[in-house]
Amino acid sequence: MSRPRRRGRDVHGVLLLDKPQGASSNDVLQKVKRIYNANRAGHTGALDPLATGMLPICLGEATKFSQYLLDSDKRYRVIAKLGQRTDTSDADGQVVEERPLTFSDEQLAAALDSFRGETQQVPSMYSALKYQGKKLYEYARQGIEVPREARPITVYELLFIRREGDELELEIHCSKGTYIRTIIDDLGEKLGCGAHVIFLRRLAVSKYPVERMVTLEQLQALVDEAAAQDIPAAQLLDPLLMPMDSPASDYPLVNIPETSAVYFKNGNPVRQSGAPLNGLVRVMESESGKFLGMGEIDDEGRVAPRRLVVEYPA
């Protein structure tokens, strides 16, 4: 019995969406999916409704590799309001405490420096992490606080941009799993005044080019232009997509010949000279340049398939 065909197009790749403020990541994901008429879509780590900026959206087979972007570095621009603490650590929450600003410039510099490098961070209750199968923010909305373990994070760079009155602007380059709201809340406590996020923009994810970001309005304009020209919208939309292997671009590339690719695609490990000694790799067919999927070097030094691209008929 053949499986039912998915609704929508077999379109594969990654769209770098510039998420608007006030919208949830899932809302914009569904809009992009509809605009592209894609049969599958998924994002690579949610942005808060308050936040704007780069939200990579994976379409089709690219959704299989979105997990690798979750492990990538991110860069943010954030503006904090000093002197007020909120229950969500951002401007969408309720003010729970107000305190005067009494710290010196030297104390601010020392506090900022304490966040640089490898540290431990206790996630906010207003996060999508799960405790006993339920998201933390669901507990928080019921007024329930549950235990959270501190997690290792790395802040590679923390730049002081400006301070004007009770506003502090920073740029932060950080590792996966870093909550900017929590950094700002913790900073406010170190300064003794409290703080919360009033502006947050994700500037970059991994090595994706910032200039390839597009807005929902730009996508809709292309749809309208295609209709006016009486051509398929895909003709204008699809060139915006990054390659489906781009979420895993940080991993080494292994090219295998067509003869080996047949075995690899059928789930069998293959030998390839020049492959790394261990770890995950991206696997391409050398003759066609076609991305085959992710492999891992096994104990015998072979490239074993771990996640494969399945080609759907057009």
Swiss-Prot record:
Keyword Amino-acid biosynthesis: no
Enzyme Commission code(s) on record: 5.4.99.25
Active site: 48
Sorted UniProt keywords: Isomerase, tRNA processing
A single BP term in Gene Ontology: mRNA pseudouridine synthesis
Pfam family, one: TruB_N
Residues annotated for substrate binding in this entry: 43, 76, 179, 200
Reaction(s) the record says it catalyses: uridine(55) in tRNA = pseudouridine(55) in tRNA
Principal EC category: isomerase
The organism's place on the tree of life at top rank: Bacteria
Molecular function GO terms recorded: RNA binding; tRNA pseudouridine(55) synthase activity
Biological role stated in the UniProt entry: Responsible for synthesis of pseudouridine from uracil-55 in the psi GC loop of transfer RNAs.
Family of the protein in this entry: Belongs to the pseudouridine synthase TruB family. Type 1 subfamily.
Annotated protein name in UniProt: tRNA pseudouridine synthase B
Taxonomic path: Bacteria, Pseudomonadati, Pseudomonadota, Gammaproteobacteria, Enterobacterales
Encoding gene per record: truB
